Amino acid sequence: MGNWVVNEGISIFVILVWLGMNVFLFVWYYRVYDIPDKFFYTRKLLGSALALARAPAACLNFNCMLILLPVCRNLLSFLRGSSACCSTRIRRQLDRNLTFHKMVAWMIALHTAIHTIAHLFNVEWCVNARVNNSDPYSIALSDIGDKPNETYLNFVRQRIKNPEGGLYVAVTLLAGITGVVITLCLILIITSSTKTIRRSYFEVFWYTHHLFVIFFIGLAIHGAQRIVRGQTAESLLKHQPRNCYQNISQWGKIKDCPIPEFSGNPPMTWKWIVGPMFLYLCERLVRFWRSQQKVVITKVVTHPFKTIELQMKKKGFKMEVGQYIFVKCPVVSKLEWHPFTLTSAPEEDFFSIHIRIVGDWTEGLFKACGCDKQEFQDAWKLPKIAVDGPFGTASEDVFSYEVVMLVGAGIGVTPFASILKSVWYKYCNKAPNLRLKKIYFYWLCRDTHAFEWFADLLQLLETQMQEKNNTDFLSYNICLTGWDESQASHFAMHHDEEKDVITGLKQKTLYGRPNWDNEFKTIGSQHPNTRIGVFLCGPEALADTLNKQCISNSDSGPRGVHFIFNKENF
């Protein structure tokens, strides 16, 4: 239990508080509409569907208030910077912003479904009551408002049978129109957010996600028409529904039961979302301001297997290890921004990214930079680009530990280029505050040739460490997870050579996936009574594996070895 608390305690606490707030709001507002006399006649008309529609609406307000906050990248970077004095456990919660964003989105989808279904029943019953296709009591309540000086309870005022009556409500009432629009927006946003769409059709994901603007506008005005109505406070003093509801034929004829008066609930949603919407507007203004700042591409390097490196400079640009930026190239697309991990170190006088050419946008950038041509390209011919960032990630905490495990899978190796470079600069310059003493680096890939630029970096570090007589500082393992029989024979023939046949490094490439249980046990035994940071940039399946290993191999007491799991999310 103690092992689990070390890694997941605060995260679970945050989730439980969030779930608790959802349960509290649902129960509270269910009782608000299910018990008080104010909605006595509304319940007689709509039944339990009234409370079942309003309770999830309150939860929707709460979650729509939260949904924008995890994607305010500049706000999160500010909080991460201002919380530098806090423990890494606190800062790690900011690195799970996208996970929380997705959880809130699914909660919105759940409450939207409940809210919509309940209101479909409400509309059906209201329409039926207006066309005398209901019980006499509901018909009588629905007729209130037809005479002068009466206020209505049933928001359906036209006498049109279903299903035409329901469609009429959907296309004429503000709540119906906005409800249809925001539900369609939500469906499109969620269905285009699957992993397959994001990876293969990023443009679809990008553009449909911007339907959130329509979603929030529709949400803010959804209740402006006040169709959910209850008895007014003044009317309740004159007309007590529990005493008068059985004498509906005598309403207005006897003193104690005058015709009840009704009014709609004032819209509340805008009060929940105006704050986050203002923060997000500020976020977008900051992004726009940054995008207008001049960025100079100082060098474009073409690496094997369609990978390019962009080295850039921007006035006032300051970065930390493992951070990422968003890049826009107007020549390729005037609206699209794409995230890339910085591969340069803070100590260098430029910042760089490595881009694998795998889609339409990257292919367009590849051609715009002249990388498809053999001849040298002049700098003035390079395209203009805009940069937003940098933004913080879990990797910033790498210097908070004495021992770290860095695990990169495929292109997920890029954040660690920045870390390894920076560590080496600090080591060579004998940085007095360098706490980090040992790095265990794991690189899992199906084809190392696709990332030869990183193998070149490792070769450089290997050579420099030998010159400094400190080969024990960095222990690295390159694991090739994909090969065929001919490659296996070739590897076997050259196994006894001094340098690895694939990477040219002295450390030989391993074939297959690491035995993580053995790796964690070995590292834990070599560093007792140590907090070991585990940093991953890779797929969710590997994240689950490493997270479980961190929990199972951490000691339960306050002393002993503790593996602290961190994952890149951007």
UniProtKB/Swiss-Prot annotation:
Residues where heme b 1 binds: 101, 206, 209, 280, 287
Sites where the protein binds FAD: 199-200, 337-339, 341, 354, 356, 361-362
Ranges for domain FAD-binding FR-type: 287-397
Keyword Transmembrane helix applies: yes
Cofactor: FAD
GO CC terms: monoatomic ion channel complex; NADPH oxidase complex; plasma membrane
GO process annotations (BP): inflammatory response; innate immune response; monoatomic ion transmembrane transport; superoxide anion generation; superoxide metabolic process
Residue positions the entry lists as glycosylated: 132, 149, 247
SUPFAM superfamilies according to UniProt: Ferredoxin reductase-like, C-terminal NADP-linked domain, Riboflavin synthase domain-like
PTM comment, free text: Glycosylated. Phosphorylated on Ser and Thr residues by PKC during neutrophils activation. Phosphorylation enhances the NADPH oxidase activity and stimulates its interaction with RAC2, NCF2/p67-phox, and NCF1/p47-phox.
GO molecular function (one): metal ion binding
Topology, Extracellular side: 37-46, 131-163, 223-267
Function: Catalytic subunit of the phagocyte NADPH oxidase complex that mediates the transfer of electrons from cytosolic NADPH to O2 to produce the superoxide anion (O2(-)). In the activated complex, electrons are first transferred from NADPH to flavin adenine dinucleotide (FAD) and subsequently transferred via two heme molecules to molecular oxygen, producing superoxide through an outer-sphere reaction.
Protein name per its UniProtKB record: NADPH oxidase 2
Organism field: Bison bison
Gene from which this protein is expressed: CYBB
